[in-house]
């Protein structure tokens, strides 16, 4: 059914349920905490001593239930997108893309803690506390920027913005000509990039490329944190030791 211009459907109802329940639990957790400062409110995961077991509500149990609500809300939203796509007779590109973001979240809060043996390895729900978790996790591996998949993820994020900024600026340039000139179309846009870099991916191709880069960035970011802990426990700079032992360095007299 519809609410005004919005299609709700079964999964819209389940999404609303999980969103409202999760939000209410966050407010409850904030009420149990020491402050109502929006920057300092934090819903922490259970202590590592609880392992993969259930914790009391005030000691991480709320975090566990909120995580279930978040996954339920995200999954319901993706399935609602599937319903809408099928009604419109279009492809499932939007829910498929959103599923990569869901995968990244589930990796952080479920898959990685499962592999490491404790829910306490998940990140807390809070603005400053979550940023502290990111910082502490990075320092736990000495320099997280040496994580090869982190490098790939950052590269893809920046490349996504570069590619779509080039596309967006080209469109604005084409449809906003100087006074007295006519509006330009796709053939002018293609010609510009052929003259500029020798190749134009085309108006459809740039959107496919942007989607590919964005999804690759999300997948690589999930992979980079999944590797840290379950599969690599040392500092990431030491991972690059293999580079120093390549046969090529035996040449040159050094």
UniProtKB/Swiss-Prot annotation:
Residues engaged in binding (7R,8Z)-bacteriochlorophyll b: 130, 150
PROSITE patterns membership: REACTION_CENTER
Keyword entries, A-Z: Bacteriochlorophyll, Cell inner membrane, Cell membrane, Chlorophyll, Chromophore, Electron transport, Iron, Magnesium, Membrane, Metal-binding, Photosynthesis, Reaction center, Transmembrane, Transmembrane helix, Transport
One biological process term in Gene Ontology: photosynthetic electron transport in photosystem II
Transmembrane domains' residue ranges: 10-32, 60-88, 93-115, 148-175, 202-227
GO cellular component: plasma membrane; plasma membrane light-harvesting complex
Record: residues binding a ubiquinone: 193
Membrane topology field: Multi-pass membrane protein
Chief localisation class: membrane
Binding positions for Fe cation per the UniProt entry: 167, 207
Domain of life: Bacteria
Gene Ontology terms for molecular function: bacteriochlorophyll binding; electron transporter, transferring electrons within the cyclic electron transport pathway of photosynthesis activity; metal ion binding
Keyword Transcription regulation found: no
Transport in keyword set: yes
Cellular compartments annotated: Cell inner membrane
Subunit and interaction comment: Reaction center is composed of four bacteriochlorophylls, two bacteriopheophytins, two ubiquinones, one iron, and two highly hydrophobic polypeptide chains (designated L and M).
Task of the protein: The reaction center is a membrane-bound complex that mediates the initial photochemical event in the electron transfer process of photosynthesis.
Similarity field: Belongs to the reaction center PufL/M/PsbA/D family.
Protein name: Reaction center protein L chain
């Amino acid at each position: 059914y519809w609410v005004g211009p919005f299609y709700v459907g079964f999964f819209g109802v389940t999404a609303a349920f999980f969103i409202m329940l999760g939000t209410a639990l966050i407010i409850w957790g904030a009420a149990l905490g020491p402050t109502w400062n929006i920057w300092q409110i934090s819903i922490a995961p259970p202590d590592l001593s609880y392992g993969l077991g259930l914790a009391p509500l005030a000691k991480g149990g709320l975090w566990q239930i909120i995580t279930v609500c978040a996954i339920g809300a995200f999954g319901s939203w993706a399935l609602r997108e599937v319903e809408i796509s099928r009604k419109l007779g279009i492809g499932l590109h939007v829910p498929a893309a959103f599923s990569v973001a869901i995968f990244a979240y589930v990796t952080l809060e479920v898959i990685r803690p499962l592999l490491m043996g404790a829910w306490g390895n998940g990140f807390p729900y809070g603005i400053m506390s979550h940023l502290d978790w990111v910082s502490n996790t990075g320092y736990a591996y000495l320099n997280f920027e040496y994580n090869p998949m982190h490098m790939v993820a950052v590269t893809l994020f920046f490349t996504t913005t570069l590619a779509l900024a080039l596309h967006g600026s080209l469109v604005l340039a084409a449809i906003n000509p100087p006074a007295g000139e006519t509006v330009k179309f796709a053939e002018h846009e293609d010609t510009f990039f052929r003259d500029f870099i020798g190749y134009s991916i085309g108006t459809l191709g740039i959107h496919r490329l942007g989607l590919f880069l964005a999804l690759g960035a999300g997948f690589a970011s999930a992979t980079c944190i999944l590797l840290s802990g379950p599969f690599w426990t040392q500092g990431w700079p030491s991972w690059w030791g293999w580079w120093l032992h390549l046969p090529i360095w035996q040449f040159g007299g050094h």
